[in-house]
A protein has these predicted regions:
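Flexible, active-site-proximal loop/turn residues at the rims of small-molecule/cofactor binding pockets
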Residues: 22, 119, 181, 185
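Detector for outer-membrane/organellar transmembrane beta-barrel domains
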Residues: 128, 138-189
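Outer-membrane beta-barrel proteins
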Residues: 39-41, 66-71, 122-124, 156-160, ...
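Outer membrane beta-barrel
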Residues: 1-118, 129-131, 137-146
Length: 189
């Protein structure tokens, strides 16, 4: 909250990304944020393999596939900030492995799932007894609609947290409406 007669300049994000293919079936991406509110962060560093049509596998540091809004980069946001759900639980990057299948014909959908360390970007040297998982399905009945269902299990410390998310959006030219619901359940092991 600002006080009267206060002001500032801020570079909120200054991202630099390099991506491409080293082979027709092998791609890479590296993305760094040179100014995430003043600090430098490595965001993505992964390799993606496309063994057959519509299927890919990704290994490295990436955004965890969860929620409808989390995969949008700052330049793709509809508002100045992320949605509350994406900001609080969906804006997670981690080191892991994902598989993704995309169906473009008939009833289009995208199904993506992965296993992750669960330690985020900062504590990658830790050893884990439990991996986190995330599964996300996007149903695309036509070009204007998107229904996204996802689930994620994380285990910080000794508490298991299961999250279930459902989101839907409709867009047509300059109109976009979106709604999302998240259910979070805590358990102990």
């Amino acid at each position: 909250q600002t006080e009267t007669n206060e002001s500032r300049f801020e570079v909120r994000n200054a991202r630099f990304s390099v991506s491409g293919n080293v082979h027709p079936i092998v791609a890479y991406k590296a993305e760094i944020d040179l100014s995430d509110e003043g600090s430098i962060k490595m965001l993505d560093a992964y390799t993606r393999v496309f063994p057959v049509k519509n299927l890919n596998f990704t290994l490295g540091q990436m955004r965890v596939p969860f929620t409808i809004d989390a995969h949008r980069s700052p330049h793709q946001q509809y508002f100045a900030n992320r949605s509350f759900i994406a900001k609080q639980v969906g804006n997670v990057r981690d080191v892991g492995f994902t598989g993704c299948y995309t169906q473009k014909e008939g009833f289009p959908f995208i199904l993506e799932g992965g296993l992750f360390n669960g330690s985020g970007l900062t504590d990658q040297k830790e050893w884990h007894k439990t991996l986190n998982y995330s599964i996300k399905a996007q149903l695309l009945p036509n070009k204007n609609w998107n229904l996204t269902l996802s689930t994620q299990m994380i285990k910080p410390e000794h508490t298991r947290i299961n999250m279930y998310d459902a989101g839907i959006y409709y867009q047509n030219r300059n109109f976009h409406v979106e709604a999302e619901y998240l259910y979070k359940m805590y358990g102990h092991e």
